[in-house]
């Protein structure tokens, strides 16, 4: 009787292993920003290929602002959700079209949200392509010189207020 109850358990364990082993044998364990080579500490990361970023030239300025506001709020990590949504609330409505394009590239081209966070906090240097006026603005904002509490993304009520 014990052998009969053991067989389904053994079958489940073997089926889980047999499902994962082909994936693990062909998966590349790398993650890096385009153009950078992985360091030893990054060799255990799984690389997920993303389509290359393309500038949207057929988009109106208001549509771009709305999209960037959404993309600033919906990130892959909480730290950037908070940081970028507060930054967008403060600066997005006053940005020129050129600055909006630079911000679009900054938040959408890197394949890893941690890169953006490290560049904004100056923990790592940003690639030359991202060294621009918007990155400087983001770095200054990240320093939080006014010592504001930044514990969560802003509520959306400010979208319905009259512009300052």
Curated annotation (Swiss-Prot):
It is found in: Mitochondrion matrix. One of its GO terms (cellular component) is mitochondrial matrix. The keyword Magnesium does not apply. Disulfide bonds: none annotated. It holds the Pfam family Sdh5. One of its GO terms (biological process) is canonical Wnt signaling pathway. The keyword Transferase does not apply. Residues 1-27 form a transit peptide. Keywords: Chaperone, Mitochondrion, Transit peptide. Its main location: mitochondrion. Interacts with SDHA within the SDH catalytic dimer. Plays an essential role in the assembly of succinate dehydrogenase (SDH), an enzyme complex (also referred to as respiratory complex II) that is a component of both the tricarboxylic acid (TCA) cycle and the mitochondrial electron transport chain, and which couples the oxidation of succinate to fumarate with the reduction of ubiquinone (coenzyme Q) to ubiquinol. Required for flavinylation (covalent attachment of FAD) of the flavoprotein subunit SDHA of the SDH catalytic dimer. Belongs to the SDHAF2 family. This is Succinate dehydrogenase assembly factor 2, mitochondrial. The gene is Sdhaf2.
